[in-house]
């Protein structure tokens, strides 16, 4: 199985407001950068989109070390999601899970792979995380002055 390092980040101006996501994939000395954004979104949605996009870009089953600076993504995928699925996508307080469609997409995207989730402190000088942040901000840029639409930028 191919081993991949994925560094993901999301950004949002306004929260809600225009947002972007970025991902840096590394394997065997190769790199691939991904980015995209939306006109009206939240930082948590963009963090999820970054992870979904990174895993969905892989064309074959891989061993993935996925690095995120989002405690929301790390805690959700490493713990909360199993309870949400058991509870019909409701929280322990019986409220609908926020961003359920994205959590479901992330759950689906990870199935083909062996993913190890890592949390890293954001904006702490970690070069790959800083690059993912730059990609997320670049993915947001077209939406800062645009109408409500979605654009995937490669």
Swiss-Prot record:
Signal peptide: none annotated. It comes from the Bacteria. Mg(2+) 2 binds at residues 9, 133. Its cofactor is Mg(2+). Keywords: Cytoplasm, Endonuclease, Hydrolase, Magnesium, Metal-binding, Nuclease. It is found in: Cytoplasm. It catalyses: Endonucleolytic cleavage to 5'-phosphomonoester. SUPFAM superfamilies: Ribonuclease H-like. Belongs to the RNase H family. Its main location: cytoplasm. Pfam families: RNase_H (PF00075). Binds 1 Mg(2+) ion per subunit. May bind a second metal ion at a regulatory site, or after substrate binding. Its EC number is 3.1.26.4. Mg(2+) 1 binds at residues 9, 47, 69. Endonuclease that specifically degrades the RNA of RNA-DNA hybrids. It is an enzyme of class 3 (hydrolase). This is Ribonuclease H. GO terms for biological process: DNA replication, removal of RNA primer. GO terms for cellular component: cytoplasm. Residues 1-141 form the RNase H type-1 domain. PROSITE patterns: RNASE_H_1.
């Amino acid at each position: 199985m191919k081993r991949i390092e994925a560094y993901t980040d999301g950004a949002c101006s306004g929260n809600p407001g225009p947002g972007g996501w970025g991902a840096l994939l590394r394997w065997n000395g190769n790199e691939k950068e991904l980015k995209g954004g939306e006109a009206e979104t939240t930082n948590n949605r963009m963090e999820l989109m970054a992870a979904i996009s990174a895993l969905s870009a892989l064309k074959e089953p891989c061993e993935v070390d996925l690095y995120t600076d989002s405690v929301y993504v790390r805690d959700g995928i490493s713990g909360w999601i199993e309870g949400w699925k058991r509870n019909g996508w409701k929280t322990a307080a019986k409220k609908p899970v926020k961003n359920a469609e994205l959590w479901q997409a992330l759950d689906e995207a990870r199935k083909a792979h062996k993913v190890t989730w890592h949390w890293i402190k954001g904006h702490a000088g970690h070069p790959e995380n800083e690059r993912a942040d730059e990609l997320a901000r670049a993915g947001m840029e077209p939406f800062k002055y645009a109408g409500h639409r979605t654009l995937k930028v490669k």
